[in-house]
Structure formats: structure tokens, C-alpha cells
Amino acid sequence: NAIQERFDQGRGSVGLADFLRRAGIRFILLRNDLQRAPGLVDPILTHQALAQSPGITRVKSFGPGVGGEPYLEKGGHRVVINQGWQSSYPALEVYEVHDGGGQFVQASTAPVVVGGTESLLSLADQGVIQDQPTILAQDLSRSDPSPGSVILTDSQRARVREIGSLNKAYSYVLSPNEDTRFVDPRDYLSVDAQKWRTQAKYEGISSLTVSSSKSDAGADLGRGPSAAMDENPSTYWVSAALDSDPWLRIGLDQPMALGEITLTTPPDSPDPQVVSVQTEGHLTDQVKLRAGVPQTISLAGTRTSWVKVLGETNNGFPMSLAEVSMPGVSVQRVLRLPAVPAAWGAPAAILLEAALDQTAACASVDLAVRCLDISSSGEEDHGFAREFTIPQGAGYDLEVTGQPRGGDALESLIQRDRLISIQADSAVVSDPRGSALAAIDGDPGATWIADPDADVLAAFAHDLPDEMRSDRVIA
């Protein structure tokens, strides 16, 4: 899964060569002749990820060229292929991992990793480990004496798996007992391995459950139930498309008298959505929610230990909620790491990693940057929180790696103190490589594309340092 995620995002990995060497892998066979289909990684992203991974080079190719030009022209008309994500590759390519091959070391020198095998690639990326073998904590007993060097990670997360699928074949991270509504298997983990999982917990409420979610296994991970209570109107929960009886239920920490609840639907949701709200001993009348408009519903001050929002009728569309708020209730979702046994002492290193599972929107294709209108979102696009305990106090050097979030704030930062600036009414992607900045960067391979679904006509403003006369605009 760790390698699959890198390829799906077109994201290179400085530790990938070490990761493969540890597994005894020397060669990678890349099949460019396979038919593209949903659920498979686009070859454009695979090539980009491999090109950005040091220690891995192409050494051989076979067969005829497949693919082709990103567009076709005839009679003055142009047809774009796969939204521009198209190039020509040999049918088969062989990549070599330098100095690949297996190795043996003494077990006493191998570090113990608390987490799953997927953490090994991230640990190699950060330089915590190289290509030496490791031991997983799940292969040891908690009663064993200190195994030596211990590394704590949040990688083995409690998810439901869509067995048989390769790409995005897992759900958002689950809280304890939340997986009871799923048909898909939680994961094929041994009883010992399940004790080392990282699980979600909610602070401020006792539980948050839904009838279904678009962020179930194989779907959009950013549309889970917590998105409806994160105080961020740009994120939202969406029920599964075939859920005929959708609902969202909030378990309170303790019974309380609730006078009202405020519901907000996404701006692009069906208008209206019809819902009702149920508490212990009270059910409201049906209420029509207008898209993007907060609606406060009276709960008559009833004392209750839970609140349930029921979708009544939506003409076949999924139910969606951007924000659910109640006076006196503040919610934060936290991922809680497994506890390290006291006998093992403090970990030598701790790795906490945000879920970077949003599908890449822009990619480099033959020296040009091409961006797609991709609607999927990541589980932790807007921040993350972790909770863990260690057996004893210890000192650590803190290292933080981040990446910029696309949007108006980033574009303003990039243009700070520049003689010229540019603003656009919309963009089809949030990636700055596809923003209005691409129109003035001097690179004909980078392009600004307006959002075709925007409510306004596509336009951008170019601010100059002073008044000047111009007799032409070149685009």
C-alpha cells in the first residue's frame, strides 16, 4: 500500500530504493501496455514517481510504443486525450534498484518498529532507517524484555479493506467498534497485530457514526463522518450513493439539554435536502436545508445522550452535511497510537505522518505540466492530530516536514514583493501549478484553466507596476 500510494500521487521517494533493497528486490517491470481503467494508477504518475526516486533507473525497454500524443488535430479542431495525461512509452520497461539484493544481520541489531510494514518506506524517506532489516512489534510479545531500539509509528491504522482492489482500497481510519456496519473485512491481521493498530477517537463527544460514507473502502477518503464536525465548511460528509436511509448519529459524553442544532450542507449539494432531527424522546418536523445555508433547528431543550440527523428524501441523491454544530459541544478527531510496553522503555524515534491520500491533480508530461479536474479529497488535507504515551520521559529532536496547501493564501505568498501580480476568478485545481500564476511564469508548458463549474465567467486580472500603453496581448 505504501508504494501504491506514492505511485498514485506521482510522488517520488528518497527511501524507495532502500525499501526495495530490504525486500530483496532488484528489478521492477513496468507494464505500459495494460489498458487504463478506474482503480489503476495512471502511467503518467508512475513514471513521475520513479523519475523522482533516487537509486532507481531504467535499464531496458521492450516492445512497440504505446500511448501517443496528448491531443489530435484535424481540420482545425483539437481533441484532447485523457485531459492531456498522455505520452508514448515502450510497452515494457525494466527499472533497476542499484545494489539490490537480500542480506542477513543479527536479530539483536535490528530495530523494532511499532506499526505496519507500510511505515518502513516513510522511515526510509526520513532517514530513520536505511536498508537494514527490521522486526515488527507484532512479532514480539508485550511481556518480552526490552528488544533494544524501538521506533513508534502511526502507520498500522484501523481501516476496512476492499480486498481485490489495489488503488485506494481502504477506508478512513476507524474508531473502536465502528467497523461493525461494514461488509468488507477490516483487514487480514492476526490477533497480535490488531493490538498494535492506531485507532481514531473523538474528543468532546463519545461517538460519531453514520449509516454509510463516501469515504468507505475504495471511495473518497475526505468524505468521512468527522468532516461534518471539524468546523471547516470546505469539508463535508457524504453518504453512499445507494444508501436509501441515510443518517448521522452523535453520541454525547454525558446527557445534556439541547436547545438547538445548526446544520449546513455543502454549497454544491442537492437543493433542498430534507432532514429531521431525533433525540431521546423527541423528533422534529421535516426541515428543508438550502445548499450552503446554515439552518438552525429547535430541539425544545430536551435532555438527551445522543442526536441523530435523518435524511428523509433527496430524490435519489446522497445525503451530505458540511457542518453540524450544537451549543456547548466542540469536537476534535484524534488518532491514538498503540502503547509501548513499559519494559521496552522510551522509543528511540517517533514518526507521525499525515495521510497524504489525495489523488494528484497535476503531473509533468513531456516537459509540460498538465492538470486534471479531480474531485477526490484526502482524509487529512486540512491538518491532523495524534495522541500517544511512552513508558518514560525522553528527549527528542523535533523535525517537521510540510507541504504548501494550494489556494489564494499560497498564491499571495508567492507573489509577495513582486512587481506584477495576477488573480483569477477560479481555477480547476488548487495546485499552484494550475493556478493563474501559470499564465505569467514564462513557461508555455504550464497552463491556467478556469473552473468550468464556476458561477462566474472565466477571467483574471493582471496588475502592472505602473500605467503603460499596450497594443497587444499574447496568449
Language model: regions and residue ranges:
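Extracytoplasmic
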Residues: 1-475
